[in-house]
């Protein structure tokens, strides 16, 4: 019985200390799961843009270009929450004009040229540009969407040397 006051004192101290160390804090976690962006249609995942045959003599000065060749990227389906997209192109930049896509350097390659990529309004799309430098293109939510682009050759040096035209670019999509 002599230990009873001791045990009561220990229990009282434990309750007092545990309440003194307790803190009332609340963490609220919020989020939102939105509808999907868009899927790139199979026909737009790996494709070739044919810039056709062009005569080296038509590139008589730096900046001379060929006629534009259209190509498209099909997004299907697009989610109901998506309203716009930014499309950026990345690849190896031409050493004389960083906004142009460089030609692959092979034995049979043409030289003195780069590939210019253009948007639907035929304004140049800067190669390897940060997202902040790209403009939004409006999409129709819940529907397939077609994004139209153009490509053409541009002289970066004269004279241009005849040969094969090959280059590779990757496109990236950012949705709003």
Swiss-Prot record:
One of its GO terms (cellular component) is pilus. Keywords: Disulfide bond, Fimbrium, Signal. InterPro entries: Adhesion_dom_fimbrial, Adhesion_dom_fimbrial_sf, Adhesion_dom_sf, Bact_Fimbrial_Adh_Pro. Pfam families: Fimbrial. GO terms for biological process: cell adhesion; cell adhesion involved in single-species biofilm formation; cell-substrate adhesion; mechanosensory behavior; pilus assembly. It comes from the Bacteria. It is found in: Fimbrium. Belongs to the fimbrial protein family. Involved in regulation of length and mediation of adhesion of type 1 fimbriae (but not necessary for the production of fimbriae). Involved in the integration of FimH in the fimbriae. This is Protein FimF. The gene is fimF.
């Amino acid at each position: 019985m002599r230990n009873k006051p001791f045990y009561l004192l220990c229990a009282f101290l434990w309750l007092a200390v545990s309440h003194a160390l307790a803190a009332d804090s609340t963490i609220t976690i919020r989020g939102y799961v939105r509808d999907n962006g868009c899927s790139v249609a199979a026909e737009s995942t790996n494709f070739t843009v044919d810039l056709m045959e062009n005569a080296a003599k038509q590139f008589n000065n730096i900046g001379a270009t060929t006629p534009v060749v259209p190509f498209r990227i099909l997004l299907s389906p697009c989610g109901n929450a998506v309203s716009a997209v930014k499309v950026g192109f990345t690849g190896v930049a031409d050493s004389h004009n960083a906004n142009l896509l460089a030609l692959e350097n092979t034995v049979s390659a043409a030289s003195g040229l780069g590939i210019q990529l253009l948007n639907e309004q035929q304004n140049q799309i800067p190669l390897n540009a940060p997202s902040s430098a790209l403009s939004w293109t409006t999409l129709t939510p819940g529907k397939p969407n077609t994004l139209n682009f153009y490509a053409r050759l541009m002289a970066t040096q004269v004279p241009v040397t005849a040969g094969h035209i090959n280059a590779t670019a990757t496109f990236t999509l950012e949705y709003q």
